[in-house]
Design a protein with these regions (language model features):
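Active-site/ligand-binding-proximal alpha/beta "capping" segment
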Residues: 91-126, 133, 184-192
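Glycine-rich phosphate/nucleotide-binding loop
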Residues: 123, 127-130, 138-143
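A cross-family phosphate/adenosyl-ligand binding-site feature
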Residues: 1-99, 137-172, 176-177, 181-194
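Flexible, glycine/proline-enriched loop segments at strand-loop-helix junctions
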Residues: 106-107, 131-135, 162-165
Length: 194
């Protein structure tokens, strides 16, 4: 597979349903088992902490990216293989995007949705051709998928090949879909890393 590193976007909020945390932990473990590097936002709380723990416990390579203002002991995972501190949140997003060959959004809030939509937007305007997966735990992303269908139907989103978005309720199903995507116009185009 041309995918070597996967960027995971997800929530950092504590106190969410344990099913979300368990799915995030499983996702991290699966990435590690496949020999894939986890690229993520360096957090130790919520789903961020769970996905990192899952990967680390399975012996995976985990790289965290954090903006200076969030580089605090209460927030940042201390056990990461590598930690990169960036000047601001925009640089963090750009670095995470550059490091990754594919993206997965787990459930999350405004930050996760911002990262997800920026990634989809960049694909649509041709800045990258990397696949994006939604882990649809507990149907979390059902309303979002319906919204995207509506936008396609009403002509606000063009149904081209630029955006490759897959979803699955289970981590193993999602990773299988991501790793087996066939790009219509040749897979070599999106794997380029300048």
């Amino acid at each position: 597979s041309p995918i070597r590193a996967v960027c995971v976007y997800c929530g950092s909020a504590d106190g969410v349903d344990p099913e979300y945390l368990a799915a995030a932990h499983e996702m991290g473990g699966l990435l590690a088992a496949q020999g894939l590097q986890l690229v993520y936002g360096a957090g130790k709380t919520g789903l961020m902490g769970a996905v990192a723990e899952g990967a680390l416990r399975a012996g995976g390579k985990v790289t965290g990216f954090v903006p200076e203002n969030l580089n605090l002991p209460a927030l940042v995972h201390e056990g990461l293989g590598a930690l990169e501190v960036l000047p601001d949140i925009q640089m963090r997003k750009a670095r995470m995007s550059a490091e990754a060959d594919a993206f997965i959004a787990l459930p999350g809030g405004y930050g996760t949705l911002d990262e997800l939509f920026e990634t989809l937007t960049w694909a649509q305007i041709g800045l990258h051709q990397k696949p994006v997966g939604l882990l649809n735990t507990r149907g979390y992303y059902d309303p979002l998928l319906h919204m995207i269908e509506r936008a396609l139907r009403d002509g606000f989103i063009y149904a081209g090949h630029q955006v490759v978005l897959v979803s699955d309720p289970q981590p193993v199903g999602l990773l299988h879909k991501l790793l087996n995507i066939q790009f219509p116009d040749g897979i070599e185009r999106w794997g380029n890393r300048d």
